[in-house]
Swiss-Prot record:
Stated role: Required for the formation of a threonylcarbamoyl group on adenosine at position 37 (t(6)A37) in tRNAs that read codons beginning with adenine. Is involved in the transfer of the threonylcarbamoyl moiety of threonylcarbamoyl-AMP (TC-AMP) to the N6 group of A37, together with TsaE and TsaB. TsaD likely plays a direct catalytic role in this reaction.
Keyword terms: Acyltransferase, Cytoplasm, Iron, Metal-binding, Transferase, tRNA processing
Protein name: tRNA N6-adenosine threonylcarbamoyltransferase
Subcellular location: Cytoplasm
Binding residues for substrate: L138, V139, S140, G141, G142, D171, G184, N277
Binding site for Fe cation: H115, H119, D305
GN (gene name): tsaD
Length: 347
């Protein structure tokens, strides 16, 4: 069964093709991605209207590229999947519209996929895929959550951010330091030259006794420190970047370890854009190795938004019998969409 996946939730256009035949994890046949980072740099952030227009320009050429790389034709596709949400409404509508139009033209079923489920399952495409059950740390620009995952479609929310996401803390702190967009990777690069102990920054909710996160206070502390430094900021920027990164990573690592202790599980999956952060990987690996915990990540090029994770999630849901294939081509998107029902929140 060939599944074509389309991702267009924010500022990356991704298309991929997987083979979900049989009971094995779907096999990635080909994928292509176009990032809009350069276009949005001039504005210091994502401009939704520009993002939508660029998705329109890119999605069909990327689809043709993916099919050519896989040596398959569109007529051979069995299911067309797309990101239904969460994300930017206009951007989501582009992917949904193209997916439904393609499926209708081909007479094939169409399927909406949850963006976060794609991230959560993306490590199954790695050379070291996880095994159920596991704890997942979903950490990106828009989300920071800890979940217990027993199988495909069974997700229990353990904790989440009550304000800013970790990726947002990276990006906003970088902006306060005058670093270019996207701020997170630039801050991480600069931090390599700095001393993470040079500034004492808060670790919000670190000792709260639950698994929730908060990063708004850290952002405020970075702003206060930047103002305090004044003209000296330029000379101390690397130290402030290192201290900021250390604070964010410290919270993510300790909360993840607390989740592992609470659940008693021995496998941790880290997914989302921030999962590519080298310091986070290093500290998690070291801490988990001491505790006999296996850590699984997506391949680095699949940490950010991509079509492969959408095609994979669709394929895995179909294999698990969680979807009934539909040929109705009216569609709606869900810019706000929780992956876990409220009642699934652990006490």
């Amino acid at each position: 069964m060939l599944v074509l996946g389309i991702e267009s939730s924010c500022d990356e256009t991704g298309v991929a093709l997987v083979d979900a035949g049989g009971s094995e994890v779907p096999r990635l046949l080909s994928h292509a991605l176009f990032s809009q980072i350069q276009m949005h740099q001039a504005y210091g952030g994502v401009v939704p209207e520009l993002a939508s227009r660029d998705h329109i320009r890119r999605v069909l050429p990327l689809t043709r590229q993916v099919m050519a790389q896989a040596g398959r034709s569109l007529a051979q596709v069995d299911v067309v999947a797309y990101t239904r949400g969460p994300g930017l409404a206009g951007a989501l509508l582009v992917g949904a519209g193209v997916a439904c139009a393609l499926a209708a033209a081909l007479g094939k079923p169409v399927m909406g996929v949850h963006h976060l489920e794609g991230h959560l399952l993306s490590p199954f495409l790695s050379a070291d895929p996880p095994v159920f059950p596991f704890v997942a740390l979903l950490v990106s620009g828009g989300h920071t959550q800890l979940m217990r995952v027993d199988r495909v479609g069974s997700y229990e929310l353990l904790g989440e951010t009550i304000d800013d996401a970790a990726g947002e803390a990276f990006d906003k702190s970088a902006k306060l330091m005058g670093l270019p967009y996207p701020g997170g990777p630039h801050l991480a690069d600069l931090a390599r030259q700095g001393d993470g102990t040079a500034f004492k920054l808060p670790r919000p909710l670190l000792h709260s006794g639950d698994l929730d996160f908060s990063f708004a206070g850290l952002k405020t502390a970075v702003l206060t420190q930047a103002k305090k430094l004044g003209p000296e900021l330029e000379n101390r920027k690397a130290d402030l970047a290192a201290a900021t990164q250390a604070a964010i990573v410290d919270v993510l690592v300790k909360k993840s370890l607390a989740a592992m202790a609470q659940t008693g599980l021995k496998r941790l999956v880290v997914a989302g854009g921030v999962g590519a952060n080298a310091l986070l990987r290093s500290q998690l690996n070291a801490a988990c190795q001491q505790r006999g915990i296996r850590v699984h990540y997506p391949e680095l090029h699949l940490c950010t938004d991509n079509g492969a994770m959408i095609a994979l999630a669709a394929g895995m849901r179909l294999q698990a019998g969680l979807e009934t294939l539909q040929r109705g081509y009216t569609f709606d998107v869900k810019p706000r969409w929780s992956l876990t029902p409220t009642v699934a929140r652990s006490a």
